[in-house]
A protein has these predicted regions:
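HIT superfamily nucleotide-processing domains
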Residues: 1-130
Length: 130
């Protein structure tokens, strides 16, 4: 299946839709989940157009994971998180709802993890810890 360049994350990357950005460089964007499962729930996406993890070139995947670690450390520091849930759903059958590969960083323990919330989160503490 061809990459859908009209998906919400592609539109965010092009600046067509707003996002609360936590981190951005020439290869990756990290931003707050619009319906967070916990305070500090952050999404990390490569700028490479790839629908699933398996579509992402190895070099881009490796770099994205480096940024995932950087953001996870910032979340732990900023929010005094005792743990981070890293979640990557690859493909519709796995529950992926946006057809652009992305990584969820959720400060929580698996026992506290809930469904997406109804309020937007605050990114300023995480930004300050970077």
């Amino acid at each position: 299946m061809a990459y859908d360049d009209q998906n919400i994350f592609a539109r965010i990357l092009r600046g067509e839709l707003p996002a609360i950005k936590v981190y951005e460089d020439d290869q990756v964007l990290a931003f707050m989940d619009i319906m967070p499962q916990a305070d500090g729930h952050t999404l990390v996406i490569p700028k490479t157009p790839a629908e699933t993890l398996l579509d992402l070139p190895a070099e881009s995947a490796a770099y994205t994971i480096q940024v995932v670690q950087k953001i996870a450390r910032a979340i732990e520091t900023a929010l005094d998180a005792k743990g981070i849930v890293l979640m990557q759903l690859s493909g519709a059958a796995a529950g992926q709802t946006v057809p652009h590969v992305h990584f969820h960083l959720i400060p929580s323990s698996i026992h506290e993890l809930g469904k997406h919330g109804s309020q937007m989160g605050d990114q300023e503490k995480i930004k300050a810890a970077l």
